[in-house]
């Protein structure tokens, strides 16, 4: 069960993200359609925020951990059923893959991705200076939500700190471990890094859609981007430090999740908001901020995303001015100098 969790999480995230899009008619009101990768990312954020709400309620109402997990799973079941019913009633004759012309480089990109999965299952995870596993085991054994202080290593009752780390990530892992027959190590050190890697590819894939058109040459460029990202992760996995080392060895840590998924997605949303005037992305950006706070807290989650938003916005505004005055060439149209 634990090894099919990545596929299950993507399916649940997709339907959870698709439901509000259909209810609020996002694609019809907005001139830029929402891609499936963006739908999955937003759906995963919604699932995490929903668990955060349940965790807070369980803490302050004294509800047991197993009870809140069962309620959460029941709510997820209702969401999946409602999403499938609504999607069926709004079904359109649209294929997942409308063009079967696949560039050869895409096959290499898939091979590189599979190689990364194999490395995640082969290499030893870096568990130094990490107390997440202790918190997860404490929650499961004690039957209520706990958090382990990263400085003292002391297990304390559930608490929310505006200046530190909020413990929903630990409890979220505990919930997943409960659903996968308590395979805690396989979950945290194998399944979760695979999930993070997949969502990281989705986030960078959104940028690939912006920079590359839908022609065969554009698909080839996208595949090259995926190969480069995979090569960096593979090369980083054999180093002793660095961004890509942590991506492969510590994919379960909150700061790695923030860098791998939240940072590129936040920059993408800022581009859509200020360049494409896509106001729906404002709601997605707010959801991203809230989820980052729940995953890594203020210092390691929320504040870095605010910095990324400011920098991305400044770059987009400068780019618009540069395109307007013809200082740089447009990537897709070739206009400018």
Predicted features along the sequence, with ranges:
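Membrane-helix boundary/interfacial segments in multi-pass membrane proteins
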Residues: 4, 60-70, 239-258
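Specific aromatic-rich, kink-prone transmembrane helix
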Residues: 12-20, 253-275
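Internal/C-terminal transmembrane anchor helices
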Residues: 101-118
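Active-site lumenal/periplasmic loops and adjacent helix-entry segments of GT-C-fold
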Residues: 115-236, 242-251, 261
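Transmembrane-embedded, aromatic-rich helix segments that form part
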Residues: 299-315, 322
